[in-house]
């Protein structure tokens, strides 16, 4: 998958564009965690991409691109407008700067980028947060959570799965805005809970209590949909 991603990046560069690996992959590489989940971002617009590759799906500059029998999620550099539904922006504006694109992302640790040669590009302090195992938002946490309520559960999941600690201001923002997760679909809530409980059920349950999420939703309603055997055994003891 990585080799094909590098070839895709190389093809974009040969056509005058830039493209980087972003999101969880650079972070996990720095942590020594194996992952095959590769997301890309580029200054090429969806129109540009359509001239070079098979674009199977596109919305607001986020594309599913088929390349050598692999599907890649590729996003055009963008700024986002207001969020009315606590989940997605009402509009986006394409930009030409990687740094401008990274500013819209959720947590600083997820703003690390990687070029095709394996060189890290750190424009917002991601390496420092990763090295100190810190979860903090890009910008004001109250604003970032108000934009997208899923960030509450994502922050808790990263604490559980990666063993990172939460920034104190982010902790307060989560506790004060915890009820906003009710704006999320049950499907998205289940997906996040499943990821954290599958990794570390005891820590997941404790974190959900610490952040008072169990006061907002019936955690068991979601967990009964299916978990790993270890998680089911653990919950059965509660």
Place the predicted regions along the sequence by residue:
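Catalytic cores of the polymerase beta-like nucleotidyltransferase superfamily
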Residues: 1-238
């Amino acid at each position: 998958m990585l080799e094909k991603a590098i070839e895709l990046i190389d093809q974009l560069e040969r056509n005058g564009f830039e493209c980087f690996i972003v999101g969880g992959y650079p972070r996990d590489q720095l942590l020594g965690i194996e992952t095959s989940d590769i997301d890309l971002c580029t200054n090429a617009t969806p129109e540009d991409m359509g001239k070079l590759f098979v674009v199977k799906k596109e919305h607001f500059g986020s594309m599913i691109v088929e390349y050598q029998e692999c599907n890649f999620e590729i996003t055009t550099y963008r700024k986002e407008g207001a969020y009315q539904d606590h989940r997605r922006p009402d509009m986006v504006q394409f930009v030409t700067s990687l740094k401008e694109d990274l500013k819209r992302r959720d947590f600083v640790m997820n703003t690390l980028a990687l070029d095709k040669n394996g060189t890290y590009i750190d424009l917002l302090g991601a390496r420092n947060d990763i090295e100190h195992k810190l979860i903090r938002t890009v910008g004001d946490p109250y604003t970032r959570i108000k934009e997208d309520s899923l960030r509450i559960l994502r922050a808790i999941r990263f604490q559980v799965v990666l063993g990172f600690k939460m920034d104190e201001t982010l902790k307060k923002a989560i506790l004060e805005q915890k009820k906003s997760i009710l704006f999320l679909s049950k499907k998205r809530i289940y997906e996040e809970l499943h990821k954290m409980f599958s990794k570390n059920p005891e820590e997941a349950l404790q974190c959900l209590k610490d952040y008072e999420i169990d006061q907002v939703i019936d955690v068991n309603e979601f967990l009964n949909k299916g978990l790993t055997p270890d998680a089911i055994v653990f919950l059965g003891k509660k």
